[in-house]
Amino acid sequence: MNFRKHLFILLALAACSACHAQSNEDFGYEPLSPDSAFATGAENLWGHEVFPSMFLFREGGYKGRTAVVANQTSVVGATHLVDTLLRAGVNVTKIFCPEHGFRGTAAAGAKVDNSTDPKTGLPIISLYGKNKKPTPEQLKDVDCVLFDLQDVGCRFYTYISTLHYVMEACAEKGIPLIVLDRPNPNGHYVDGPVLDTATCRSFVGMHPVPIVYGMTIGEYALMINGERWIKDTCDLTVVKMDNYHRDSIYELPVAPSPNLRNAHAIALYPNLCLFEGTNCGVGRGTDYPFEWVTYGTDTLDLRHEAAPAAFSLKYLMEMYRRVGTRRAASADAKPFFLKSNFFEKLAGTLDLRRQIEAGMSEADIRATWQPALDKFKKTREKYLIY
């Protein structure tokens, strides 16, 4: 980040109410106080010299043609980022949206079509339809891209894959990218198997990182650039947060996706998403998605269990045991794992399914991924900004 090269200062807006964290003693680590003066990157955009100097500031707003990668989480106080930019006179020309769409209502995996925002009339281009990367044609009339999505710190949550493709497209066209940083609600630890890119790379896992990587989306963008996971270097600026502490709780003001509705589900998500590669359900279509696991009438109810402060295989291994018992009693019972390789894509390794089927303990399984995890932690340190 080099803010000196940026000469433009956005017009001051009316005071925006800062989002702040709320306590949740289930997490077991220190919450932020309401008066901690916390501010997201989007809130810090105002008054910072962040727009590229090649574009001139003119009275009435920034006239460089700006594309925004955003969804329902892209808020400045109680106002959407796009509305905030337009009120400031920024020349927003189009919106790119990720999985779940601009309003965050599309189901997981559902195709998101291009559309028009009824409020602003701006075109919305889907990055979760037939193409997941902005095309040269879509960027030909763009001078700058703003990226503002709320991540949850898990490798298989696809917003970081969208970030990868946006960075790649911007780098190829020489377009500056500005990432507005936001907290990682699972940012207080690093754990899980590191993805094997040779065998398990997909849109639910593109980089050699563990399931829980303990970085903000801004830090992750720096790592994509620094580790050369894209061919060309992206002209990247990260607008930092104020008073963000990795070990503090941050209750998201807006649900990041339809099935992560509260802090408890978000904390369980790293542990339960692996079930998406099995014949178990994780509560989709109910009032408690990612707070329980089902296999037929067998239920693992986690709604009232203290939110985990670390990644664990205990839920997966417990349900594997229960399904084994049920299958022994019924020849019609479905196998635990799906026949496809989706579990491997989520786990990031071909080994985990085999290890569980072989009856290995969690401690022994962990020992197999520890060397790669330790190596990642050292790499990660280079890109931490908080």
Annotate each predicted stretch with a short phrase.
Residues D151-L163:
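Glycine/threonine-rich flexible loop motifs
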Residues S23-R65, Q72-A78:
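Short N-terminal or domain-adjacent regulatory/targeting segments
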Residues C200-N271:
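Conserved anion/nucleotide-ligand pocket segment
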Residues G104-G109, I178-C200:
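Glycine-rich, charge-decorated loop segments at or immediately adjacent to ligand/cofactor-binding or catalytic sites
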Residues N91-H100, L180:
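Short internal beta-strands
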Residues V112-V142:
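Glycine-rich oxoanion-binding loops at beta->alpha junctions
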Residues M1-D26:
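Bacterial Sec-dependent N-terminal signal peptides
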Residues T294-A367:
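Conserved functional hotspot residues or short segments at active or partner-binding sites
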